[in-house]
């Protein structure tokens, strides 16, 4: 019975030692880089906004242009 307790104790000690040893050798994760906003995404957002404004103005002005008698010369 004494040998069974010593084997169980040794197995438990080995398991705990292996877990602690694997945690000690682990590397910490590198921190994530801070989010940055580059100029191209800002420029693209402004371009989309200007295209929407141009589209809305086109739809607002077009009925006025179509109803009047419009001539180039």
Curated annotation (Swiss-Prot):
Glycans are attached at residues 31, 33, 35. A lipid is attached at residue 37 (GPI-anchor amidated serine). The keyword Signal applies. It is found in: Cell membrane. Residues 1-26 form the signal peptide. InterPro entries: AGP16/20/22/41. Its main location: membrane. It is a lipid-anchor; GPI-anchor. GO terms for cellular component: plasma membrane; side of membrane. Contains 4-hydroxyproline; hydroxylated on Pro-31, Pro-33 and Pro-35. O-glycosylated on hydroxyprolines; noncontiguous hydroxylproline residues are glycosylated with arabinogalactan. Pfam families: AGP. Keywords: Cell membrane, Glycoprotein, GPI-anchor, Hydroxylation, Lipoprotein, Membrane, Proteoglycan, Pyrrolidone carboxylic acid, Signal. The modification 4-hydroxyproline is found at residues 31, 33, 35. Residues 38-73 form a propeptide. The modification Pyrrolidone carboxylic acid is found at residue 27. It comes from the Eukaryota. Proteoglycan that seems to be implicated in diverse developmental roles such as differentiation, cell-cell recognition, embryogenesis and programmed cell death. PANTHER family: ARABINOGALACTAN PROTEIN 20. Belongs to the AG-peptide AGP family. This is Arabinogalactan protein 16. It comes from Arabidopsis thaliana (Mouse-ear cress). The lineage of its organism: Eukaryota, Viridiplantae, Streptophyta, Embryophyta, Tracheophyta.
